Amino acid sequence: MNNKEFVAKIVDVAKNYKTLYVMGCFGAPMTEANKTRYCNNHSYNKKAARQAMIKAATADTFGFDCVNLIKGVLWGWNGDKSKTYGGAKYAVNGVPDVSADGMIAKCLNVSTNFSNIEVGEAVWMPGHIGIYIGDGLAVECTPSWKNCVQITACNCTKSGYNRRNWTKHGKLPYITYAKAETKKLESGNDIVWELMNGKHKIEISEVARAVNALDKAKTNPEYMSLYWILYKLVNGNG
């Protein structure tokens, strides 16, 4: 599974399924048998308020906690209400049963610098974990706010989303990460606009080709500073 496929599955859970925060649960539907099981499997779930929530859940509600959302999807969860764990199978696909802190310890290229985060990376803070889905957003399962699998703002403020300030991020070793695609642009104007707005990673050969066609950049003050930066880069003066 690659990072984009993984994120699509995670977002699908957040957007298209009824979910509830249930400690120790990796996607089980809230059948009567599962309610009895999870009301007694963990001290957190034994709290009166949490037990009331679990018992009130409909049978088409799936239980998750933060790290078990990630593990559940990697273990094959597919929203099958007829299966004990919603289609997931315990500890398959080479993915171990670890905690949130254990999962970030398994991750690669762990960093506190969020300027280079990629779609599908785990985002972490002590005792809690989620998945970055792009555009400054993450998916997490938390008892906070909506008490379910939900989309939140990742280390930024975005209208319509609750904000979570994560500490670290890293690549899950159980999926592959596609390299960022470069984009070939047809005109100098296009490439200047794309670079100014941070839309794409563009190869230097494309910059060289585009500089020769920068008609708008030469006349529009808004583009002038970037034009000279490009010119210097292409001519080895940057």
Model-identified regions with their sequence ranges:
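Loop/turn positions that initiate beta-strands
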Residues: 119-121
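N-terminal capping segments
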Residues: 1-83, 126-128, 139-141
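A residue-identity detector for tryptophan
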Residues: 75-77, 124, 145, 166, ...
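Short, solvent-exposed alpha-helical surface patches in non-cytosolic proteins
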Residues: 67-72, 178-238
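Extracytoplasmic/periplasmic, Sec-exported soluble proteins
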Residues: 2, 58-65, 112-115, 187, ...
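Aromatic- and glycine-rich peptidoglycan recognition patches
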Residues: 1-20, 79-115, 126-184
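Generic structural signal of hydrophobic/aromatic residues within well-ordered alpha-helices
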Residues: 6, 10, 49-54, 94, ...
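Generic alpha-helical secondary structure signal
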Residues: 25, 42, 48, 89, ...
